[in-house]
Design a protein with these regions (language model features):
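Sec-dependent N-terminal signal peptides of Gram-positive bacterial secreted proteins and lipoproteins
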Residues: 3-24
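A residue-level marker of the well-folded mature domains of exported/periplasmic proteins
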Residues: 21-442
Length: 442
């Protein structure tokens, strides 16, 4: 009992003595301050330290959902049960709405600046096509809404902009979108979503780049001279359409993720992309696990400097929603003006690039899966970043790549959870958190 009491007092003292690294704070009611998080985590950290020598059941081990937030694909409502699976469960992603608005504004700014030359056939209609990743994915929904809202082509349905694919809309008669008008230098243009579809392949995999490449071929064969702008929910699909048609025809293409190939392509005519701060996300994904395993304040090395000097700035690099137990990295627009700063998408973020002391943060084993080993962003950007941060955080991570189609392809490889100290899960579908928590609850 004396040992446990001492551990409890030491952990509490450690939490209360941490010094914040400052920076801007968000005004959102969903966001909590570093001080509030420190106080809220004090008891949790103390309890973790007190039981450090005890055998931890799988259901009580640290868990981080990432990239795909547990939620209903039909309504977008968060799965609070999954987000509160245990006291050390968190989600790490990015601020989807903020990023969606940035992408829409990036496209609009480009059109305004180049309206006279962007109208390729001079018909006064600036037509764009839209590649939709997954109609049931919150991030895809947000990006579709962001583009339509900013360009004025969105139609409200039940209080929000409809994110339903329009199909082919060359005549402007689709019900889920509308024509918008834009005046530039005294001339009025019509902005029209000529076509949009979900890029799902025959096997059921969404966000499919090959499907997007095929789609642009079909669209251009029918109304290619009317396409003035290409927009995509991500860079994987965007680059497929850019390489298949847009590059040779000098049609600006806008994506999302700031993948290395897309950033490099900006110098060749790719219009722009959005960095979702993958370096921050990857760090947070493993950092919340590291902190929980060490029994320290969850904010350590995030909004509060750790002993190595690692520290992010809340409101600049990320925001935290205490209610949702979710960390959201903030996005940055990448255009011709700044793309040279983003050419290496796998470089660790300078603010959190310091090695932890292994005597204080001993080696632990983590099971982590990527929902689709073929996903361009996750495989070429996110995982390489994770592999760099796992070294800095003294974590031995087993990386599991899924097929992008079924949860069972992943869960079948989680047959030995007792061998691991923590878990990081990237679901195929946001509805399917129970497929994983049921395994951890056995």
């Amino acid at each position: 009992m004396k040992r446990k009491a001492l551990a409890t007092m030491m952990a509490a003292a450690m939490v209360l003595s941490m010094v914040g690294c400052g920076g801007a704070k968000t005004d959102s009611t969903a966001s909590t301050t570093t001080t509030e998080k420190t106080e809220a985590a004090a008891t949790e950290a103390a309890d973790s330290a007190a039981s450090a020598d005890a055998t931890v059941e799988n259901k009580d081990k640290p868990l981080c959902w990432f990239n795909r937030q547990p939620s209903s694909s039909a309504t977008g409502e968060l799965d609070k049960e999954a987000l509160n699976f245990n006291g050390n469960t968190y989600y790490v992603g990015f601020d989807a709405n903020q990023g969606a608005e940035l992408q829409g504004q990036m496209v609009l700014d480009y059109i305004k600046k180049n309206a006279e030359t962007i109208d390729r056939n001079g018909d006064g209609v600036i037509g764009y096509v839209l590649a939709i990743g997954d109609i049931g994915h919150n991030d895809s929904i947000a990006r579709t809404r962001g583009v339509r809202s900013t360009l004025g082509t969105g139609v409200e349905a039940d209080g929000t902009v409809d994110s339903t694919p329009a199909g082919t809309n060359v005549d402007g008669k689709a019900k889920v979108v509308q024509d918008a008008t834009l005046e530039v230098d005294g001339k009025t243009y019509t902005i029209r979503e000529l076509a949009s579809q979900e890029m799902k392949n025959s096997a059921g995999a969404t966000w499919d780049a090959a499907t997007a490449g095929n789609a642009i071929g079909i669209w251009t064969a029918s109304f290619g001279d009317q396409i003035d702008v290409v927009v995509s929910n991500n860079d994987g699909m965007g680059m497929s359409m850019f390489n298949a048609w847009a590059k040779d025809n000098k049609v600006p293409t806008f994506g999302y993720d700031a993948n290395s190939d897309a950033v490099a392509a900006i110098g060749e005519g790719y219009g722009g992309t959005i960095s979702q701060h993958a370096d921050v996300q990857a760090c947070l994904t493993l950092r919340v696990l590291r902190n929980a395993l060490d029994g320290v304040d969850i904010d350590t090395g995030i909004g509060t400097a750790d002993d190595a000097g690692n520290c992010l700035v809340e409101g600049e690099d990320y925001r935290y929603s205490e209610e949702d137990r979710s960390y959201y990295a903030l996005n940055i627009a990448v255009t011709a003006e700044n793309y040279n700063d983003f050419t290496d998408s796998t470089r660790v973020y300078d603010k959190v690039a310091n090695q932890l002391d292994e005597s204080k943060s001993p080696s632990k084993k983590v099971w982590l899966n990527i929902y689709n080993a073929s996903d361009n962003f996750l495989s070429s950007t996110y995982q390489p970043l994770l592999e760099k941060y796992d070294d800095l955080l003294n974590l031995k991570v087993d990386y599991i790549g899924g097929d992008g189609q079924t949860e069972s392809n992943i869960t079948n490889r989680l047959g030995n959870p007792s061998e691991y100290d923590a878990f990081a899960i990237n679901m195929v579908k946001t509805d399917n958190a129970a497929a994983y928590t049921s395994l951890l609850s056995k």
